[in-house]
């Protein structure tokens, strides 16, 4: 198993439960991939994936298996649209109408479109991209306009996709928007007490994981599979490779189908965790745990407040400012102090009352650069995944990871589960 992110660890755990001996090789000194929790300013802060959803299927099942508790964050959320922050409650969908985000006339006008979406999404899941293959060639903007959801998309779906996945949803495949929306508009947001890393740590503690092991190349040979590393050659009946798509060409010779899925572009993320000298007041940032930004509303993709996830222990707080796309790329090359200053300015545009609340110590804030944050889903991407999965039936080296998944963690975990099933079939093959 090459790669110890959520996809690789899920695959390894699935195989281990089936009685297969698995060794996990991880290049970095840390396991977990996008699950990365850190201590900062008296808070537990997520320096990668920030939340889970009650609509997820694989990750909550893993948490239950491993006795890792889940807890709901504040139900207060917000969307920034047209220069205004609209607060609402995820457990009360009508609150989006009362807030002005979805005016009553707009909401009523979108009902036929919602009925069309419900009918067309019936029987489709949120884990497997191929459930939505028929929408692969159409852009989200064309699709939402065609089914009569243009205004709902503009005011809620596009800000949500941008805030969650650091991408302009108008140009992605209609399939991606449909799958995200199929999670449900009122799903509760979840976290793990002590941070999301508790789950990947729990998985790793039950597996043979070798961190700090760089895989130079993996190949099929006459005896099975050989992984050439800086600490020797590992031989096995089969291998799963769950690394970011841009890393795949360096570690293996790719078939045409593997090359196609590895060509996926990734969104760029820049997380700036700003330490605050006090907890945020209830009316600041609309009282929301997270604020999701429309792609036309400035450089930020989202804001997230640690105390409203139950992650603040002392009197301070942390507000995470998430930059995406060209803004993330432009800022990432600067010094951390410059990036922190830029994040403070961006935050004050939305909440000027925080101008005197920043913790002054440099160590109270942190900058996290994520050059390959999440896979994008342009029209046509799912056809490449479909072609790869058909070809993978005959391979001893199987891909997993987010190159085969939607940009959310539950789908990456499901890709690991799928890869484990393919490897099990290889091992059991006469």
Per-range role (PLM):
Residues 1-24:
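N-terminal Rossmann-like FAD-binding beta1-loop-alpha1 element of flavoenzymes
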Residues 16-40:
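Glycine-rich FAD pyrophosphate-binding loop
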Residues 18, 216-332, 350, 389:
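Mid-domain catalytic core of redox enzymes
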Residues 35-55, 114-129:
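Glycine-rich active-site loop/strand segments that organize a redox cofactor
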Residues 50-57, 132-138, 147, 182-204, ...:
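Short beta-strand to alpha-helix junction loop
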Residues 59-60, 64, 69-171, 183-185:
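Mobile amphipathic helical/loop "lid" adjacent to a hydrophobic cofactor/ligand pocket
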Residues 176-230, 234-238:
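Helical element adjacent to the flavin cofactor pocket in flavoenzyme catalytic cores
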Residues 303-430:
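Conserved flavin/dinucleotide-binding core of flavoenzymes
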